[in-house]
């Protein structure tokens, strides 16, 4: 991880109360997970699929095998999308994951809206994210009633970013982060900065208050856990140490890192040392 990325995830850890875990990671092949767990929590982007409908080798067959063997599946994603829309997009890629099995970081916006009595906000993100604000009763405005900015992606230009900075420099400002991820993997193996890092920069530049939804924070995991049978053996499978693995550890479930996507082999040991976390299991993919 690059330095700014590490600092962001350390900031998240501080917000959650600074805890750590250091189990000995076991390198296994994906099929070995079948016998170990009853419930599978999956990250979405970078774990099962990537941009343009690209599906990682073996991912569809792995999900299908889970269905055939009666395993429970949940999608725990920081993609702040409507669950029905995301389910339909997944089906187009060959994944049968029902809307009620999807737990998105965007699900928690309504609670923050009520907590802070938000009626309107300035929005940074793609068009598909606007439905979450509408569903939560938030009007999208250039001059919101209160200095509130909601960010869920980095698909905006420099003019919109400057306007967000202006709003967040006002007294009593609040930045709501619907996707806390720092970086996302590309198909070619490179990585791109995403909304978590942009939000972190805004916070440091404007000294605004910040609320984050989604992984690694425990609420999204806890809500998903309530939907599965008690005493189930649960594993979180994802590609990101600072969100998927840390979040799983926070709520006491096992974790499995998909190596080589958002986590490079060459930096793995150092990154684990910095954050104080290692996954229970490591796989190189689903084949």
Q: How does the language model describe each region?
A:
Residues 1-53, 57-60, 64-74, 87-100, ...:
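Asp-based, Mg2+/Mn2+-dependent phosphohydrolase catalytic module
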Residues 79-83:
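Canonical radical SAM enzyme core domain
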Residues 106:
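Class I S-adenosyl-L-methionine
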